Amino acid sequence: MQSLMRAVQVNNPGGPEALELVELPMPVCKPGEVRVRAEAIGAGGPDVLIRNGTYKWMPPLPAIPGNEMAGTVEALGPGVTTLQVGQRVLVSSRELPQRGGCYAEFICVPEDAPFVLPDSIAFQDAVSLGNVQLAQAMLLAGNGGLPVRSILVPGAAGGVATMLVQLAAHHGMTVIGTASTPEKKAHALAHGASAIVDGDPAGLPDRVFALTEGRGVDLAFDHIGAELLIACIRSLAPLGTAISYNIAGGPPARDVFMELRSLLSKSLAVRTFSIHTFDADRQQRRALMEKAIGLMSQGAVRAPPTRVFPMTEVQEVHRMLDAGASLGKLVLAPR
C-alpha cells in the first residue's frame, strides 16, 4: 500500500517560489470520511491568496492551497454508506471545515462533501464548476427580482465572467462584454456574448448606450473596482444594479454614494457579492452546485479551454495566475 503522497505546501507565504512540492503521509479515512484520488486540480485566484498569506479564510500554516479537485473515490472510512469506491466526484473546499487542501494527490473529506459527477463531464472541466456556481448566485441575487434584459460583463473572457456570459445568454439576455485582445474577444463571442466593446472606463457608458438604444443595461458586473465601478454605474438602465464581486484595482477615487445621487432619477443600486454569503446556508450552496453540474452536463454551459500542467510546474502556473494573461482554466495534473 502506498504510504506517501505528493502535495504542494506553503510554509512561508510569498510569491510563486513559496510553493514547495513535498511528500506527506498518505491521508487515512476517519469514520464517515472518504479518500479521493485527484485526477485534475483547479488553480485560481483564492490559491494565490493562500500562497501569499492574505486569504481572509486562510488555513493554518503549513498550508496546502487548492480549492477544487476532481477525481475518484479511492477508499471508504468506517460507516460510509452514501458513496462507493470508483465513483467520480468533485471536491470543493467550500464544503470543507477549512479552505484549501486540494493541491495534493489524495484528500480525505466527509462523505457528504463531494459532488457526484456524471460521465459526461471530464475531470479537467469539472474544476470550473465552482465558477458556474458563483455566476448563478450572482445572477439570482442581482436585481432584486426585477426583470433583466441585458447585462454588462467587463473582462468577459475571465473564468467567472465566461460563466456569467453563458448563463445570461442561456436565459435569453443580451450580453455586452469587454475584452483586451482579439483572442479574448473571440473567446467571449464564442461563449455567448452579443457584442464586445473596448473596456476603457472613460468611454464605456457611451459604448453601452450606443448598443442599447440609449437605455443602458440592467446589471453590470465589476471585478476591478476603481474607475470601472463608476463606469458600470453610469452604464445602467433605470432601476439597474452594479454588482461588485472583486476589487482587484482598489476602491474608486470618487464617492460612490454621491455618484448614485447624481443619477438619482434612475434609482440605481450597487451590490457587493461574495460566494461566502452561502457559507452558513449549506442547502442553497449545494443546490447551486448541483444546478451547475446539471447545466454543464446538458451542454447549457461549457467549461473554458483548459491548460494542464504537471504538479511539478506549480510555480510556473502561479506566475501565470499573477500575470493574469492566461486564457481559460489552469489545471494541475497530480501525476
Regions from the PLM with identified roles:
Residues L90, A220-F221:
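N-terminal Rossmann-like NAD(P) cofactor-binding module of classical short-chain dehydrogenase/reductase
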Residues R88, S150, T174, G240-T241, ...:
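Short glycine-centered segments of the SAM/dcSAM-binding site in methyltransferase folds
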Residues A126-P201:
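Mid-domain Rossmann-like dinucleotide-binding core that forms the NAD(H)/NADP(H) cofactor-binding site
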Residues Q2-S3, D281-R335:
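C-terminal hydrophobic helical "lid"/dimerization subdomain
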Residues T82, S92-G155:
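NAD(P)H dinucleotide-binding glycine-rich loop of Rossmann-like/cofactor-binding domains
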Residues P25-A43, T54-E95:
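Glycine-rich beta-strand-centered segment in the early N-terminal region that forms part
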Residues E227-A300, P334-R335:
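Glycine-rich phosphate-binding loop and adjacent beta-alpha segment
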Residues G203-G214:
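Short amphipathic alpha-helix with an adjacent loop that forms part of the alpha/beta core around
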